[in-house]
Amino acid sequence: MSKLLPIKVWGQGGPNPPRVAIILEELGLPYEFMPIQLSQVKEPEYLAINPNGRLPAIYDPNTDLTLWESGAIVEYLVERYDTAHDISFPRDTNDAQHARQWLFFQASGQGPYYGQACWFKKYHPEPVPSALERYIKEMNRVSGVVDGYLAKQPVPPGGDGPWLVGNKCSFADLAWVSWQMTLKKIIQTEDGYDVENFPHLKNWLDRMVAREPVKKVLSAVMPPPS
């Protein structure tokens, strides 16, 4: 990996960019953050990189590839660089398909519902209780799916699971971390969501945030209160 050129990354904070940085750290890939403010994402210079005007995006000079959408970036990084399958699985195996399934569920379930709940709690110009209630119900539903699934997964002797796929921590698990940590700063128990109601999910998250690559990324963008 030492011969690789640094991958350029636009976006560092927020719920989605850390997902990419976590994978880069887990794989030991060189990368550099490109300075950009949220006020600049709709400007022509950045729209030429990501026409959707959102963060993150990457440019990999090793393959001359520009890519946006965090889930697509995660898939690319593990398919291209995780040849030892440290956090992924061999192509054409059931585990590889199941990992993709959970990544897509994160992108279609956790991301949109958690995002809308946070929007209506913190950013919407006026309170809309029915909207907040709807999205928090969906947060509870999605968390229940993950919690119930983890509860049924066997842990082999000496294992550190349970995990979503293949008895190891993979990109399918790691993709969920940053939104869950963002949520802690915005949604409170009185809003109707408490991670303590999902003990298997909470334990799973605790195990992931204890990993050194995850700690490094989160400490940079979500420092603990002093």
Curated annotation (Swiss-Prot):
Domain GST C-terminal positions: 92-226
EC number of the protein: 2.5.1.-
Record keywords, A-Z: Transferase
PROSITE patterns: GST_CTER (PS50405), GST_NTER (PS50404)
Pathway(s) served: Secondary metabolite biosynthesis
Domain GST N-terminal: 4-85
Superkingdom: Eukaryota
GO molecular function: transferase activity
InterPro entries: Glutathione-S-Trfase_C-like, Glutathione-S-Trfase_C_sf, Glutathione_S-Trfase, Glutathione_S-Trfase_N, GST_C, Thioredoxin-like_sf
Gene3D superfamilies referenced in this protein's UniProt entry, alphabetically: 1.20.1050.10, Glutaredoxin
Pfam families noted in UniProt: GST_C, GST_N
Keyword Transferase tagged: yes
Similarity-based family: Belongs to the GST superfamily.
Summary of the function given for this chain in its UniProt record: Glutathione S-transferase-like protein; part of the gene cluster that mediates the biosynthesis of geodin, an intermediate in the biosynthesis of other natural products. The pathway begins with the synthesis of atrochrysone thioester by the polyketide synthase (PKS) gedC. The atrochrysone carboxyl ACP thioesterase gedB then breaks the thioester bond and releases the atrochrysone carboxylic acid from gedC. The atrochrysone carboxylic acid is then converted to atrochrysone which is further transformed into emodinanthrone.
Protein name (Swiss-Prot/TrEMBL): Glutathione S-transferase-like protein gedE
Organismal lineage: Eukaryota, Fungi, Dikarya, Ascomycota, Pezizomycotina
